[in-house]
């Protein structure tokens, strides 16, 4: 099996030609097989038909490029409402939205921050928790997700 980043990159390039973005790839052991979970999106949002189409495209890319050896399980899904934020473009796209940020190392005796994405550029993002604006370099972020407040 190729490196996970290489698999993600090849699949992302193939899907980009069809207007889809690979937001994240999670690989887990599932018994004797590997489970590959691709989270995909597109401009304007993704629906069930898009997910099915993306799944078929991912499967054909994996087979054509011989990316994975042996038996595997493939899942394609939308990123969901708590979608992961990995690239500067993700943070820029969701300026004004609520997010939860987990840092690799603690600052001010904490590693978790929640607030609105107040800004983003190529090297860092700004999070406003209502009282303070924090600037975090992307390289210092361990995990970032949208964290919407759901009202019923």
From Swiss-Prot:
This is Ribosome maturation factor RimP. Pfam families: DUF150_C, RimP_N. GO terms for cellular component: cytosol. Required for maturation of 30S ribosomal subunits. It comes from Elusimicrobium minutum (strain Pei191). InterPro entries: Ribosome_maturation_RimP, RimP_C, RimP_C_sf, RimP_N, RimP_N_sf. SUPFAM superfamilies: YhbC-like, C-terminal domain, YhbC-like, N-terminal domain. Keywords: Cytoplasm, Ribosome biogenesis. Gene3D superfamilies: Ribosome maturation factor RimP, C-terminal domain, RimP-like superfamily, N-terminal. GO terms for biological process: ribosomal small subunit assembly; translation. The lineage of its organism: Bacteria, Pseudomonadati, Elusimicrobiota, Elusimicrobia, Elusimicrobiales. It is found in: Cytoplasm. Belongs to the RimP family.
């Amino acid at each position: 099996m190729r490196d996970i980043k290489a698999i993600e990159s090849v699949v992302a390039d193939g899907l980009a030609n069809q207007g889809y973005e690979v937001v994240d790839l999670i690989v887990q052991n599932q018994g004797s097989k590997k489970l590959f979970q691709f989270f995909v999106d597109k401009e304007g949002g993704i629906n069930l038909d898009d997910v099915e189409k993306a799944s078929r495209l991912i499967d054909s890319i994996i087979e054509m490029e011989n990316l994975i050896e042996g038996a595997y399980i493939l899942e394609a899904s939308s990123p969901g409402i708590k979608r992961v934020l990995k690239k500067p473009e993700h943070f820029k796209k969701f300026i004004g939205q609520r997010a939860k940020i987990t840092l690799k190392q603690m600052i001010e005796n904490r590693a978790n921050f929640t607030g609105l994405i107040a800004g983003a550029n190529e090297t860092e993002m700004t999070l406003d928790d209502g009282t303070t604006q924090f600037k975090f370099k992307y390289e210092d972020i361990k995990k970032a997700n949208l964290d919407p407040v759901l009202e019923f």
